[in-house]
Every structure is written in C-alpha cells, then in structure tokens.
C-alpha cells in the first residue's frame, strides 16, 4: 500500500481505502504476534506510466501524515523514509537515489537501510 495506490496501478486512488489497507495489515500482524514497524511512502513527483496524475506529491504527503499519526496513536514505530529521500523541493525522490523517479537505486537503499535497522533493533 502506498506508491502503487497513488499511481492508480489497480484502482482510482482513495486515501481512506489505502490507509484502511495499512491498518488491516497492522491488525493482522498484531493478531499473529508479529511486531510492526510502519514507514512513510517514498516521494514521487510523477509516474512515467501515469503522467495524467499531476498531484502525486500532495497525495503522498497527505498519506504519510496519516500513516505517521496512526503509528503514533497506536505506539507503532515509524520510519520516515520520505524526509531521508526527498529532493530539495520536497516533492520528488532525490535524483541521487533513483533512475526513474519512483524506485530507489542501490544508493537509495543504502540511505534507507540504517533507518530500518535502527527501528528493528529498537523494536526487538
């Protein structure tokens, strides 16, 4: 749930539906005694395969705000990949970390890895 939802890869985007899917995954994990860590959705200014979507940055930021609020309200660790990976204009995935504007490169994953490792270590 996240980038693919905003890109409307399967259905028209609905923020409530996407957040609901995330909440459902969290609840399913908790019922099965799986520790949960939530992360922000990575930034994306546009989707080359869906150029008609013009407001991706705003949708991603709004969804991230809700994911973070849900995590805080439910005492779930939250990793903010967005801030670590966003461009200077606060809209796109930093070009240092992507070739297509959506998917991280190895260098991008190098930025993300210590963030999630720290959250995992803290959660254990």
Regions found by a protein language model. Name each.
Residues 1-19, 42-48:
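Oxyanion-hole/transition-state-stabilizing segment in secreted/luminal serine hydrolases
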Residues 14-23, 59-63:
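Charged helix-capping and loop-helix junction motifs
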Residues 23-30:
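Surface-exposed amphipathic alpha-helices with a cationic face
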Residues 31-35, 76:
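A short helix->loop->beta-strand "cap" motif at the edges of active sites that frequently abuts
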Residues 38-39:
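Structural beta-sheet core signal
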Residues 43-124:
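Catalytic His-Asp segment of secreted/periplasmic serine-dependent ester chemistry enzymes
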């Amino acid at each position: 749930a996240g980038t693919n939802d905003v890109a409307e890869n399967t259905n028209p985007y609905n923020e409530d539906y996407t957040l609901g899917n995330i909440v459902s995954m969290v609840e399913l994990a908790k019922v099965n005694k799986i520790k949960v860590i939530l992360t922000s959705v990575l930034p994306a200014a546009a989707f080359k395969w869906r150029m008609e979507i013009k407001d991706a940055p705003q949708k991603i930021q709004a969804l991230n705000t809700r994911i973070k609020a849900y995590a805080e309200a439910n005492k779930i660790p939250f990793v903010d990949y967005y801030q670590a990976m966003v461009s200077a204009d606060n809209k796109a995935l930093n070009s240092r970390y992507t070739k297509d504007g959506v998917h991280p490169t190895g260098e991008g994953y190098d930025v993300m890895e210590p963030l999630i490792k720290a959250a995992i270590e803290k959660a254990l």
